[in-house]
UniProtKB/Swiss-Prot annotation:
Protein name: Large ribosomal subunit protein uL2c
Alphabetical UniProt keywords: Chloroplast, Plastid, Ribonucleoprotein, Ribosomal protein
Keyword Ribonucleoprotein: yes
Family: Belongs to the universal ribosomal protein uL2 family.
Naturally occurring in which organism (per UniProt): Thalassiosira pseudonana (Marine diatom)
Gene field: rpl2
Major place of residence: plastid
Domain of life: Eukaryota
Phylogenetic lineage: Eukaryota, Sar, Stramenopiles, Ochrophyta, Bacillariophyta
GO molecular function: RNA binding; rRNA binding; structural constituent of ribosome; transferase activity
Biased composition regions of type Basic residues, renumbered to the chain: 255-264
Length: 275
């Protein structure tokens, strides 16, 4: 992937850096693999805001992605590489030999016309999905299962990959993109390679409107709110927060407070917390 830089012709193009979309091969998705995407705009079933700063944005159709990769030992050919408005990674359309079509996350260096497989005892080619116990140490993998047969749940964002560090007993040790080191069952499947669009972190929208197109609403500082809206609010002019430490809008400690549950079951499988 490459980044397209814009000259300052207008205020909206100043500091703009967007994807060049050079790897995209088609602009129309497979009709059988899209469905209506009901956007709740950060509200729950009662209409109460549960996630702030969401709303608006362009309409999107959801692409059905195959995270399970459970068509074992049936080869598929990469037919196209497409843009997905619901994620920052690209997706690849597969045509299986039995006639079925599926979308997967597009790995780097997987091209149109390549053949991939999923199952046990297969080759270690880019895009192939196989159990962690069959992947050699030092390999980069993505779309990793946490529980066998549940489908990939971690390492799915653009440009990410995990590295296999060790194998011992029924578990494989992986280093995740967050530098967290954790154990995962050896029967869990993972896909060889790194997720595509690894320059996504370089993208700059250049203007507020482009961020609104993505469905993101403005984030307002607590110090400029009223005291009924935020613990930092109120006062005459620019006043200090008036507290011993920064707080969230709900009065909980912010900036450095660990929020992970202390009795979470998966904590036993985390050898080193993320940095």
């Amino acid at each position: 992937m490459s980044i397209r830089l814009y000259k300052s012709y207008t205020p909206g193009t100043r500091n703009r850096a967007l994807s060049a979309f050079s790897e995209i091969t088609t602009d129309k998705p497979e009709k059988s693999l899209v469905k209506k995407n009901h956007r709740n705009k950060g509200r729950n079933n009662r209409g109460v805001i549960t996630i702030r700063h969401r709303g608006g944005g362009h309409k999107k159709q959801y692409r059905l992605i195959d995270f399970k990769r459970n068509k074992y030992n049936i080869s598929a050919v990469v037919n196209s590489i497409e843009y997905d408005p619901n994620r920052n990674a690209r997706i690849a359309l597969l045509h299986f030999t039995d006639g079925e079509k599926r979308y997967i996350l597009h790995p780097n260096n997987l091209n149109v016309g390549d053949t991939i497989l999923s199952g046990k005892g297969i080759s270690l080619d880019i895009g192939n999905s196989l159990p962690l116990e069959e992947i050699p140490l030092g390999s980069s993998v993505h779309n990793i299962e946490l529980i066998p047969n549940r489908g990939g749940q971690i390492v799915r964002s653009a440009g990410t990959s995990a590295k296999i560090l060790a194998k011992e007993g029924n578990y494989v040790t992986l280093r995740l993109p967050s530098k967290e080191i954790r154990l995962i069952r050896k029967e869990c499947f993972a896909t060889i390679g790194e997720v595509s669009n690894n320059d996504a972190f370089l993208i700059q929208s250049g203007k507020a409107g482009r961020t609104r197109w993505l469905g993101k609403r403005p984030t307002v500082r607590g110090s400029v709110m009223n005291p009924c809206d935020h613990p930092h609010g109120g006062g005459e002019g620019r006043t200090p927060i008036g507290r011993t430490r920064p707080l969230t809008p709900w009065g909980k400690p912010a900036l450095g407070k660990k929020t992970r549950k202390t009795k979470k079951l998966s904590s036993a499988y985390i050898l080193r917390r993320r940095s």
